[in-house]
């Protein structure tokens, strides 16, 4: 049994409780405020319906004939082959360039000229402007090489030696 404290002794640790009445109760098994068990003790619950409606007609399973399986596999192979050919010929049409700006030769022009950088242009913009039918990345690399540029940053009005064509 736990001792009972006097009713008017202040408790500095718990100021939210009532000031009148006992602070300690006897150690008795406290009754739970939880509701009682709602399930039977020994047997699992049985669900009578799942809530999913199903038609009352017979649902016999028919095996898929091997001809259907082979036919679908051949159809999938034909579609895969067709997509591969489209990708291959599409790459041949664009010349294999990532940006699609390459001509049939895919070469950087040999002729050089002095060009001036315009407002808002990057190195790649200049490359597209001076050699629109050549691979942009290769033209930009050639401009960088000809002018000794370490970065692709350009200043407005800067003059560059560039391949044109």
UniProtKB/Swiss-Prot annotation:
One annotated GO molecular function = hydrolase activity
Pro residues composition bias: residue spans: 1-10
Induction description? Up-regulated in the presence of nitric oxide, reactive oxygen intermediates, mitomycin C, cephalexin or during growth in macrophages. Expression is strongly DNA damage inducible independently of RecA. Down-regulated under hypoxic growth conditions.
Q: Where in the cell is it found?
A: Cell membrane
Q: Which UniProt keywords apply?
A: Cell membrane, Cell wall biogenesis/degradation, Hydrolase, Membrane, Transmembrane, Transmembrane helix
Enzyme Commission number(s): 3.4.-.-
The way it spans or sits in the membrane comes to: Single-pass membrane protein
Q: Where are the transmembrane segments?
A: 70-90
Q: What happens without the gene?
A: Mutants have stable FtsZ rings. Deletion mutant is more sensitive to DNA damage. Deletion of the gene causes a 10% increase in average cell length. Loss of the gene does not influence the growth of M.tuberculosis in mice lungs and spleen.
Q: Map out region (LysM-type) in residue numbers.
A: 116-163
Region of interest called Disordered, as start-end residue ranges on this chain: 1-64
Sections of the chain in a coiled coil: none
Offer a single GO CC term for the protein. plasma membrane
Which Pfam families does the record associate with it?
LysM
**A single BP term in Gene Ontology:** cell wall organization
- Protein purpose: Cell wall hydrolase that modulates cell division process. Probably acts by modulating FtsZ ring assembly. Murein hydrolase activity is targeted to sites of nascent peptidoglycan (PG) synthesis. Overproduction compromises midcell localization of FtsZ rings, but has no effect on the intracellular levels of FtsZ.
Q: What is this protein called?
A: Cell wall hydrolase ChiZ
Q: Which organism is it from?
A: Mycobacterium tuberculosis (strain ATCC 25618 / H37Rv)
């Amino acid at each position: 049994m736990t001792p009972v404290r006097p009713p008017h002794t202040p408790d500095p640790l718990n100021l939210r409780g009532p000031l009148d009445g006992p602070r300690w109760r006897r150690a008795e098994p406290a009754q739970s405020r939880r509701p009682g068990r709602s399930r039977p003790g020994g047997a699992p619950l049985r669900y009578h319906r799942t809530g999913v409606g199903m038609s009352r007609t017979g649902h016999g399973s028919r095996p898929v004939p091997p001809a259907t399986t082979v036919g679908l596999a051949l159809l999938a192979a034909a579609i895969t082959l067709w997509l591969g050919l489209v990708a291959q010929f599409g790459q041949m049409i664009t010349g294999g360039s990532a940006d699609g700006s390459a001509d049939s030769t895919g070469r950087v022009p040999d002729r050089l000229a002095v060009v001036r950088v315009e407002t808002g242009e990057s190195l790649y913009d200049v490359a597209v402007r001076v050699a629109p039918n050549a691979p942009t990345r290769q033209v930009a690399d050639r401009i960088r090489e000809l002018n000794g540029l370490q970065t692709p940053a350009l200043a407005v009005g800067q003059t560059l030696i560039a391949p044109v064509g």
